Amino acid sequence: MNVSSRTVVLINFFAAVGLFTLISMRFGWFI
């Protein structure tokens, strides 16, 4: 795995975590 692919994976991972955190906060953690 080269550096560019790893960077893309990290960006997608952090984007997914951020989106999940936003949804969790919006629903007050009652999921």
Curated annotation (Swiss-Prot):
It is a single-pass membrane protein. InterPro entries: YncL (IPR049611). Keywords: Cell inner membrane, Cell membrane, Membrane, Stress response, Transmembrane, Transmembrane helix. This is Uncharacterized protein YncL. Its main location: membrane. One of its GO terms (cellular component) is plasma membrane. Induction: Expressed during stationary phase, in minimal glucose or glycerol medium and at 45 degrees Celsius (at protein level). It is found in: Cell inner membrane. NCBIfam families: YncL. The chain crosses the membrane at residues 7-29.
